[in-house]
């Protein structure tokens, strides 16, 4: 059975009126989840492999996403705890499940306490095994993207989340 996740990403531009329209549109369209991102640029981790990407034999293995450019882009799109709580409630009112991508361990307990039952992990963090262990403890189902992950990292992630309900997604960033 297919699960439909509507990705709002940061397309709301920090505006809850836009986000509210997205939530209700997703619900009216029959989606199962509507998703935002819990991203706080001050928590981002520098990762060398994303500075220039990785190309092997003419094939791009890792996307190019330089740290400083990403930090600057995300800084103006930050949401706060009150907006996260509002989002969960708005989703419940609209009859759709809320979902968020968490990028740091520091937000895991906070988000679980706000009513998210399921969580998504970005492909950049599929190999962040401490993060996987943290979300495994606090959420019912894990959606884990694999698009920017090597096969051996995915195999290790399976070992880390063993016993937990999860779905792997192959989301491609372009």
Where are these regions (language model features)?
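Catalytic cores and adjacent flexible loops of soluble metabolic enzymes
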Residues: 1-174
């Amino acid at each position: 059975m297919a699960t439909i996740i509507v990705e709002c990403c940061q397309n709301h531009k920090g505006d809850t009126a836009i986000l509210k329209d997205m939530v209700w549109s997703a619900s009216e369209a029959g989606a199962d989840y509507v998703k935002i991102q819990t991203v706080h640029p001050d928590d981002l981790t520098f990762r060398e492999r994303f500075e220039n990407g990785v190309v092997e034999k003419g094939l791009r293995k890792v996307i190019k996403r330089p740290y400083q450019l990403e930090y600057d882009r995300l800084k103006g799109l930050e949401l706060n705890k009150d907006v996260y709580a509002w989002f969960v409630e708005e989703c419940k009112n609209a009859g759709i499940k809320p979902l968020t991508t968490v990028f740091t361990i520091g937000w895991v307990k906070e988000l679980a306490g706000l009513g998210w039952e399921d969580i998504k992990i970005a492909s950049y963090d599929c190999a962040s095994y401490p993060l996987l262990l943290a979300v495994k403890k606090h959420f019912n189902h894990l959606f884990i993207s694999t698009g920017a992950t090597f096969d051996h990292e995915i195999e290790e992630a399976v070992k880390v989340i063993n016993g937990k309900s999860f779905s792997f997604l192959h989301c491609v960033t372009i």
